[in-house]
Amino acid sequence: MIIVKLTANRICCSLLQLRRSYEHFYIFVFLPEIPLFRFSHLKLFPKNLQIQRLVSAMMERTYGRRKPGIPRTLSDSLNDSVSQTEYLSSSSSPDIEPIDYSLLPFSSQESSSLWHSSSRSNFREDYPQNGGVVRRAKRVRNGAEAAAFTSTLLEAQEFGELMEHEDEVNFALDGLRKGHQLRIRRASLSSLLSICASQHQRRSLRAQGISQSIIDAILVLSLDDIPSNLAAATLFFALTADGQDEHFMESPKCIKFLIKLLKPVIVTSTEGKPRNIGFKLLSLLKDVDAARDPVKMDDPSSSDILSRVQELLVNCKEMRLNDSYITETTRPELSTKWVALLAMERACVSKISFDDTSGSVKKTGGNFKEKLRELGGLDAVLEVVMDCHAVMERWVEYDALSVQEKKDNLHKQSLMLLLKCLKIMENATFLSTDNQNHLLGFKKCLGSHDSRMSFTELTISVIKMLSGLHLRGGFSSPNTNNVNSHYSNGGNHDSVLEANRKVTNEVVTISSDTYSTVGSISTRNGSVSQRSQSIIHLDFSPTSMSGSQSSVSGNEPTTSKTRVGSTISGSFAGRLASLGSDIARTTLRTTQAGEPICKKFGEFAPPEESEDPFAFDLEDYKPSKWAVVSVNQKKSRAQKKKGCYKQSKDESLYQLFSSQEESSNHRLNSQEESSNRDCSTSLQPSHCTNDIDEECLCLLFDCLLTAVKVLMNLTNDNVVGCRQVGGCRGLESMAELIARHFPSFTRSQLFSEMEKTGSSHQKKDKYLTDQELDFLVAILGLLVNLVERDGVNRSRLASASVPITKPEELQESEQEMIPLLCSIFLTNQGSAETKEETTTFTLDDEEAVLEGEKEAEKMIVEAYSALLLAFLSTESRSIRNSIKDYLPKRNLAILVPVLERFVAFHMTLNMIPPETHKAVMGVIESCKSP
């Protein structure tokens, strides 16, 4: 508290000087014959009319009639010619009638304040730079100025509040300058996070031109503190996510800043080192405190930043509040890498337009993804993908998660980072041939592979591992009886961490500013796919940890999607759906890449004395007895539910799944002998089942779907991409995905009759879920791209065989791909044309509308499967006859009506390229011939 005795004409100037020196202040002013009153934030208090007039006069002298946002120098107050006596006499003059402030249009409380004032606000150092703006000359006072004085008072009141908001930002920006202590930097970033929390506040900052100043200050920060990095990344994303700064986002300084955020933070740990008196004295002079210690990350300033980051991302609808996380420290989304990848993903989304005359698709808007490739951004994202790939390989190898990794949700963080990277690749390859070619030309050695691996091989390997994990139901808790229990117990943890460091890329310092770039974009021949997704963890990941998630939230990732059964196919993404009760889900033990830098962030750790000499002794860091009892009760209830869940498992289904997995393992092992780059994902199922983590299943499914769409974009009208995917056994991998994730097509009554009689007219009325439909259409679209212009791929797909398990035999057998594709076509061959003629319904009939939607979805699958069979039939006479054997009346003419509707639909929308139209018309004529 500061007690000041000043004259009236000096009070405002002194107040501004005091605000530059103190964070928290209350100013009490002693004036002759005037009672003590509080002067706070230039607001009026309507209790004493004499004081009101005095304060309003001072406000007019300070701010005058200048517009908001125009700075005013301190010399303006010193050079005023009107003295204190003149103001006092004018305020007490009998010529001026008393003003009834209750009748004013608004008061200081009624005026719209865009955000609450923060105690951590100050003026920027250069605020009075250039001498400020000279305000207009003061008019000569006279007795007839009462109305004008009232108008000035209202304007000054409004302008004062606007200046208050600007002062908050300026004060926070002042704390971001070099030379300030770390706690001041964190406090300033926390204040800016609260200021930018809502959309209307960010719009106000943009209108006043303040948002650019905030971004400029963030771009020059030294990224050596994890909480500060998270706050800076979140502010950058929030202020640039509206898409109005496309050209600014394309600047090298913005892209390099995002790339720096993807690099690991090098922090020298002080754990285990005694802190002597010299260290304590040094901490008083320099910014050396426990906040830089990666183990002591549960200090109040870090927790405050985490809570504000979560609030801002929730307001931006990038994540949801989730009660399952006890604190913000356990949220896997609150990561610097994740927020940086989120900003890249949003900036890579392309705006497209359709040319009415030519029917072509054109990209409009900025060239962020092209600049990202040129400056090395795509290469940096690829490094994160490789780190996530190494993490998943260790999950497969060790088959266990440590207790701490499970507690900190590090496996979810890796999947979220991977998802965000895949989304960037999908958006970057959309309508960008340069980015596609850059990814297709990528080759790099991974830690677990002796030879160089291409991006196509890397993506297919990721798909295989994700598929295996998804079919097993996610992850299991560590088991002491496991072969690798020594890892989860920490017995051999250091050696594992050392191996992890060797596998991953070397640590790159934050100051690095040289990178190379990659790009990519998503378009499909019969369909163009693009998807923008979003989700949200403080960057505790080591060099090998990284990953990502369109609009995904903490508990249930959500995705925006557009479904078009045509040349332009929107995002076929969705959340995970149950794949049927015939698959008993078992859990897979996994191991993470290594302990994160700040792994113990969420643990209770009381600060040491040397952390902050002015800090309070926070003895309540440890959980209370009541909290411990509550946690124990929750654990016991969870264990009871877990036991009931185990007892309710269907043993016969488990045996079926075990048989299928064992046979699948044998086949994949034979594939590994021929290719060292194929990664087997069909691991032996764990014999101890656990509660299924639905959030993990959603992440696994979204990653799997997005990876397939990345390959679909790389093969769209790209001969090199089609050859690469085909040469890396991509066709066989997609065939296995269909057989394993859609067993209904191989186990249905229709498929059994097809094997016996060669054809069947009976169809099983089974609708796919939204998630199954998205995944199946993406796979079929990729297969269409692969076989449309490549005869070698057509022969490979026609001769491919997939492992299937018949329920009655409980054993695995090989099945050719052509019967499976015919089963998909006939199962989804709806009677839409007959229903269209005989059935009429209104929009009020909800059931009829839903039925029509399901029929439309079946028509999409029917069209793509028919197009795929038609392309295969043009390769050779033997393949053509094989397809006929599984169609009714051994005639390909059944495909013609479906293909004609497909072409007519696209012609109506004028969305089919001439090359595609010519190719489809050619296969239609081929199907008409006997």
UniProtKB/Swiss-Prot annotation:
Region of interest (Disordered), ranges: 540-566
Superkingdom per UniProt: Eukaryota
Gene Ontology biological-process entries: cell division; DNA repair; embryo development ending in seed dormancy; meiotic chromosome segregation; meiotic sister chromatid cohesion; meiotic sister chromatid cohesion involved in meiosis I; meiotic sister chromatid segregation; mitotic sister chromatid cohesion
Biased composition (Polar residues): 554-566
Gene3D superfamilies in UniProt: Leucine-rich Repeat Variant
GO CC terms of this entry: chromosome; nucleus
UniProt entry keywords in alphabetical sequence: Cell cycle, Cell division, Chromosome, Chromosome partition, Meiosis, Mitosis, Nucleus
One Pfam entry name: WAPL
Gene disruption: observed consequences: Fewer leaves, more flowers and higher germination rates.
Chief localisation class: nucleus
Compositionally biased residues, Low complexity: 541-553
InterPro entries in alphabetical order: ARM-like, ARM-type_fold, WAPL, WAPL_C
Subcellular location: Nucleus; Chromosome
Domain WAPL: residue ranges: 854-909
Tissue specificity: Expressed in roots, leaves, buds and siliques.
Function: Regulator of sister chromatid cohesion in meiosis which negatively regulates cohesin association with chromatin, acting as an antagonist of CTF7. Cohesion ensures that chromosome partitioning is accurate in both meiotic and mitotic cells and plays an important role in DNA repair. Essential for the prophase removal of cohesin during meiosis thus determining the timely release of meiotic cohesion. Important for proper spindle attachment and assembly during meiosis. Helps to prevent abnormal centromere association during prophase I in meiocytes. Required for early embryonic patterning.
Subunit relationships: Interacts with the cohesin complex throughout the cell cycle.
Family: Belongs to the WAPL family.
Protein name in UniProt: Wings apart-like protein 1
Taxonomic source organism: Arabidopsis thaliana
